[in-house]
Amino acid sequence: MMETERLVLPPPDPLDLPLRAVELGCTGHWELLNLPGAPESSLPHGLPPCAPDLQQEAEQLFLSSPAWLPLHGVEHSARKWQRKTDPWSLLAVLGAPVPSDLQAQRHPTTGQILGYKEVLLENTNLSATTSLSLRRPPGPASQSLWGNPTQYPFWPGGMDEPTITDLNTREEAEEEIDFEKDLLTIPPGFKKGMDFAPKDCPTPAPGLLSLSCMLEPLDLGGGDEDENEAVGQPGGPRGDTVSASPCSAPLARASSLEDLVLKEASTAVSTPEAPEPPSQEQWAIPVDATSPVGDFYRLIPQPAFQWAFEPDVFQKQAILHLERHDSVFVAAHTSAGKTVVAEYAIALAQKHMTRTIYTSPIKALSNQKFRDFRNTFGDVGLLTGDVQLHPEASCLIMTTEILRSMLYSGSDVIRDLEWVIFDEVHYINDVERGVVWEEVLIMLPDHVSIILLSATVPNALEFADWIGRLKRRQIYVISTVTRPVPLEHYLFTGNSSKTQGELFLLLDSRGAFHTKGYYAAVEAKKERMSKHAQTFGAKQPTHQGGPAQDRGVYLSLLASLRTRAQLPVVVFTFSRGRCDEQASGLTSLDLTTSSEKSEIHLFLQRCLARLRGSDRQLPQVLHMSELLNRGLGVHHSGILPILKEIVEMLFSRGLVKVLFATETFAMGVNMPARTVVFDSMRKHDGSTFRDLLPGEYVQMAGRAGRRGLDPTGTVILLCKGRVPEMADLHRMMMGKPSQLQSQFRLTYTMILNLLRVDALRVEDMMKRSFSEFPSRKDSKAHEQALAELTKRLGALEEPDMTGQLVDLPEYYSWGEELTETQHMIQRRIMESVNGLKSLSAGRVVVVKNQEHHNALGVILQVSSNSTSRVFTTLVLCDKPLSQDPQDRGPATAEVPYPDDLVGFKLFLPEGPCDHTVVKLQPGDMAAITTKVLRVNGEKILEDFSKRQQPKFKKDPPLAAVTTAVQELLRLAQAHPAGPPTLDPVNDLQLKDMSVVEGGLRARKLEELIQGAQCVHSPRFPAQYLKLRERMQIQKEMERLRFLLSDQSLLLLPEYHQRVEVLRTLGYVDEAGTVKLAGRVACAMSSHELLLTELMFDNALSTLRPEEIAALLSGLVCQSPGDAGDQLPNTLKQGIERVRAVAKRIGEVQVACGLNQTVEEFVGELNFGLVEVVYEWARGMPFSELAGLSGTPEGLVVRCIQRLAEMCRSLRGAARLVGEPVLGAKMETAATLLRRDIVFAASLYTQ
């Protein structure tokens, strides 16, 4: 075709091409161009150079011509070695611990060795990262003290643990396995496997052995010699024996390998039986502290420790139980000598060559106890957040948080632990840190005995019972009855030298309350106020006076105490600012002698010499030195730690005569005073002002009275304004102290630490908490009741539900649901404001309780008690009111028909109508009618009360009573199915959706009940009773199962919500396995989610160490405030980024259902000390930091110390995640923070 043909031309001759030579500037180079009209020359110096394209250059160098790279040199090129085939390497196994050992068999009498036998060793394959057993090998020496977040904790005491011993000592039934058909052909997790189907092969010769025959006579369980001999006895020729075995003794094949494993597990894995409980499961054993111990030295001829004094009775009883290795709970008054019990436990551990841990709630108390115990025992160590002294000692002193960390991290110190001493146990009531005590008590292993030291608490037996059930051991409770030094309580109303004698006894040393003293104080105050009003006019009294009034009050009080030789005195003031003001206002007061001044001066110089020069010139140091020289001291959280220790030591020496302190001084070592003064009986608890609780008052007042020096202690309450009410004083001074209450709450650290251990569950931790104790202490009774109900249910006869009774189960369930729905609606009505308003005098109601069944009544009077409202109601009844429960109304409706369920079917008297007056609770009223009667409630009640007396019993009722009864009877006869009632939605204006939906559901159920067919059967009553009995038993069984299950836990919904938060953020997977982020969070001491997110978001790695420290101060600072505008832009951006991450976490928490709002979560961050920490990390002296913030020096020090602990946690977390750069920065940040006065060594450790 012509369209497809192409013209083929010959190639052009190169000589015919129009080539032109172009000179390239002045370079001497030429270029041939095949372009018509090309120029004869270019620029004078050629084209300007241009940057080559990087991508083209890289491709040219590395891809197009890579030969120039030294990588491709022959000497560096990759070589391949031929693998040598070694089939025998498949038989090699890795080195493993020897699972057996040789044990000598000796003659029982002579001890002569008769032979050796091989015994299996236990726990040879355990490690700290796979087992919770105490028999696992110790971890690395570097981790023996603190443990490691990747290690497992030791098994908590009191929990059921299936041990290896149980598996080895059981009588294992010999199970024979068919090695031809019972083996798996598809490995777990694979879709395909090996095909072992029989093939067409010639039948093997009779003399060949099968695998089953070869393995049958092997003694895999290590049987005795007789069995081995029996197996090996020749029964004939060798060939005959072997060939006859498979035929004469065929293998008994199991139906399934899974069944076999389950059968073995059911017979083998059995939780160990709990120790035999005491009678009636009495775990808390009260000990009579007044019963003398006459044979003390006969029972303990060589005590582990002796004192220079004779121990008290309660101390001897506690020591006797310690010798028996019992756990004790000593609840004694302040300064009664609880430390004696701790000292004996420490001495006993040293005698046994074991270890003791002494825990305290605060670090300052740990330092003080370290000094005291070191002076007594010598071999004592101290572990706090920033100090580690003698960790190898037999007695270690630490805070409870550190012990919790050691327990979770599997520290090997726990192995040698014999005693754990919990001091100040009443601190468990602390909202923030009380949960730590419960965690530690739950996680302690079984071999550790517990010593609890506490002030007197009313529920010591209950708390001990919880610990006893928790650990399955008896706890002996020893309480003191009286104080060693009785107290006298006074009211002081003076305010000048003329009135310094106005001291009125209110509560004497025998505990008698003197109303005379109270009224005398009131009269003295009134008289002075009237004179003041006559001179200066009336003035409203106040609780707190001004500085001038305070100065007059304290000068007059201290003058009176000094005259009576009642110094030293501790003045408890519930404000840091008022402490400083009151001490500073006493400029004219000097209470020390010249020799005491010299001693104070030398002590101050010696203690302050360890500080740098500028730190010794701090305003607080100079001011405190001046106060101490005059015998005054101040002690609160705003004081520098070294100054607080100086004040404490001088006070213990008697050189501080007057100490103004907050209530934290009442917690700690025994530092009693002659007198204790309360500046006020009201305090601010963080949310509101309130009176002191009895426990708080007793704890602080207990510092009065020095044992062995004072016959009585003096407690004085200042009345600067009006005298407090007598009832308030009586409740505060003589009321019962606060009970020990659970503050258990879920934290992400707790959840992650338990989730990483398969054998421990968070639900078990919640079950064993003190908050669940009231509902869990009857678990054994619930189990017994459940077993009895199960047996009873099995003995019941099945109801016949054939024919017309086929819908009997539905009818029963409809009736039950209708009743529950009606009760719910009525409960909502009674809880509403409009519902309670409608229940006024004269309202007609339907009464339904144990005595009355749907009887009409009229409300006569409405009153309120401490819990709910009480309605005094006149109710219709038979005449006379039957006292036999079998004759009452409800019995007639034992088998409910539709008319009984739908509507009320009001009670009508069978004979003459009578009435009674009863007190009803809101739940006793089944309905509120629309009818209101005009009644005179007072007259009716008065007449009814009169007729209850024997001599007026036959008097006729008043006309008001008769009229009310006739109105009720007429209303019941007119509406036998129930009078009109108030509609909860239309009449009472209830907008609750549950009420609206409940009303709709109730009407639907009424229609279903009226259409039921079972009620028409003559067998309905008998079969209904059978079904109801069965359903009631099943319902009770479901209730008991619920109480015994995890679903009844109070914190279970929150636990699921927090796990969902962790799953959303990627800390755990769908199966609950802890991922890398979760393991990093376990290493954090606080703010675990926020710190982990900041680390994984790379928000810290790009910052300098001082900037990281400044940002993290927002997580530990307790002083609210803004960061200010003088910060570098890097810090401002960092603060915004931290808040953004916190907001994201808060939003996830809200999305998962937690109650904490995003604003509350972000509001926990306080960046008020960012600039202070930033400048401190950059090297600014502490003396120059005061101008950057108005925060007290003590709080600044506290913030920096906690910040250094957080930096160490982040350093360990960075190493765990593989971030050496961040770890190095955190190490640098901690080093920058740890300097000068902030980290000055405690005086107690020198």
Curated annotation (Swiss-Prot):
GO MF term list: 3'-5' RNA helicase activity; ATP binding; ATP hydrolysis activity; RNA binding; RNA helicase activity
CDD domains registered for this protein in UniProt: DEXHc_SKIV2L, SF2_C_Ski2
Binding positions (ATP): A332, H333, T334, S335, A336, G337, K338, T339
This protein's record includes keyword Cytoplasm: yes
Entry keyword annotation includes Hydrolase: yes
Residue ranges of domain Helicase ATP-binding in the record: 319-475
Location of the protein in the cell: Nucleus; Cytoplasm
Residue numbers covered by motif DEVH box: 423-426
Domain Helicase C-terminal: 585-755
Chain positions found as Phosphoserine: S245, S256
Record Gene3D superfamilies: 1.10.3380.30, P-loop containing nucleotide triphosphate hydrolases
Annotated GO CC locations: cytosol; nucleus; Ski complex
E.C. no: 3.6.4.13
Domain of life of the source: Eukaryota
Region span, Disordered: 220-246
Quaternary assembly: Component of the SKI complex which consists of SKIC2, SKIC3 and SKIC8. Interacts with HBS1L isoform 2.
Protein family: Belongs to the helicase family. SKI2 subfamily.
Described function: Helicase component of the SKI complex, a multiprotein complex that assists the RNA-degrading exosome during the mRNA decay and quality-control pathways. The SKI complex catalyzes mRNA extraction from 80S ribosomal complexes in the 3'-5' direction and channels mRNA to the cytosolic exosome for degradation. SKI-mediated extraction of mRNA from stalled ribosomes allow binding of the Pelota-HBS1L complex and subsequent ribosome disassembly by ABCE1 for ribosome recycling. In the nucleus, the SKI complex associates with transcriptionally active genes in a manner dependent on PAF1 complex (PAF1C).
Name of the featured protein: Superkiller complex protein 2
Taxonomic source organism: Homo sapiens
Phylogenetic lineage: Eukaryota, Metazoa, Chordata, Craniata, Vertebrata
